[in-house]
Amino acid sequence: MYLPTLAASASLLVGVAHGYASPGACSGACNIHDPALIRRESDGKYFRFSTGNKISYASASSIEGPWTAIGSVLPGGSSIDLDGNDDLWAPDVQLVNGVYYVLYSVSTFGSQNSAIGLATSDTMDLNTWTDHGSTGIRSDSSKPYNAIDGNLFQDDSGTWYMNFGSFWNDIYQAQMKSPPTAVASSSYQIAYQPAGEHAVEGAYLYKYGNYYYLFFSEGKCCGYDSSRPATGEEYKIKVCRSTTATGNFVDANGVSCTSGGGTIVLESHDNVYGPGGQGVFTDPTLGPVLYYHYVDTTIGYADSQKLFGWNVLDFSSGWPVV
């Protein structure tokens, strides 16, 4: 999620691939920030959630669209008693035992007074969401992390985890109760960029084959229309992997993700600038799909002009390639 007052650290590693495919097609409501994507089991309809408008969301018959705006998940804001509870950020959506879970972040720019909340619905239809308030993952200035950008993940044993964090000491993980409405354990660090402003956030964990892939965004995410960073310091998507969901993530060069490791999956190219805020979705036709927001430099650099992007991922090398 965005902390536009903070400068980004420079990218330290080259990606597996240097030539990137253009984003997949998008029609309809395509302006977005911090997308989260899921497909409804009952009818195959796609739902896409995003920062803004108290978690705005849209639906479509395919990932390409046409996307139609639905409204807000929590039109009355969050019950969490923190500043920012009427301006919710960085959703994540998962299906848990037939119920759709949407995580959201409550915070204000540059603040560690943050919490990750939960809303649920059986159908994802408008006005069917129940706010459960805080998951128990919160932060203030006494914590080494910032409790935003939550991502739920279930490992092969059925255990649920929450990945979260932005800047400060970057990405943390905590085991969740089952069902995962509340935290069950203390948290531990799984990714850290020691250089610069520790500009890592937006973790998303995805299992493919024998590996758990930890995707994250690194760099300056926002405010490009008024203050663009030095070349290479804008948002980009990186990844580390592990044979366990709970740590020991390394990049393609063997560098630990807690020591600044991270292999580039997608960065600025052609008219695509600052891709990030990503997730990975298993499409029934396309297979693994990386989705994200980005600036189209032929349109404009404002946050309100950011677009929904997606690309099929190729894991044949053991690493995700766009």
UniProtKB/Swiss-Prot annotation:
Residues forming the catalytic site: 34, 201
Superkingdom of this protein's organism: Eukaryota
Pathways per UniProt: Glycan metabolism; L-arabinan degradation
Catalytic activity, as annotated: Endohydrolysis of (1->5)-alpha-arabinofuranosidic linkages in (1->5)-arabinans
A matching Pfam family: Glyco_hydro_43
Key words of the record: Carbohydrate metabolism, Glycosidase, Hydrolase, Polysaccharide degradation, Secreted, Signal, Xylan degradation
GO terms for cellular component: extracellular region
EC number(s) stated in the UniProt entry for this protein: 3.2.1.99
Primary enzyme class: hydrolase
Subcellular location(s) per record: Secreted
Signal peptide: 1-19
Entry coiled-coil feature ranges: none
GO terms for biological process, alphabetical: arabinan catabolic process; xylan catabolic process
GO molecular function: arabinan endo-1,5-alpha-L-arabinosidase activity
Site residues by UniProt (Important for catalytic activity, responsible for pKa modulation of the active site Glu and correct orientation of both the proton donor and substrate): 149
Summary of the function given for this chain in its UniProt record: Endo-1,5-alpha-L-arabinanase involved in degradation of pectin. Its preferred substrate is linear 1,5-alpha-L-arabinan.
Stated family: Belongs to the glycosyl hydrolase 43 family.
Protein name according to UniProt: Probable arabinan endo-1,5-alpha-L-arabinosidase A
Organism: Emericella nidulans (strain FGSC A4 / ATCC 38163 / CBS 112.46 / NRRL 194 / M139) (Aspergillus nidulans)
Gene name in the database record: abnA
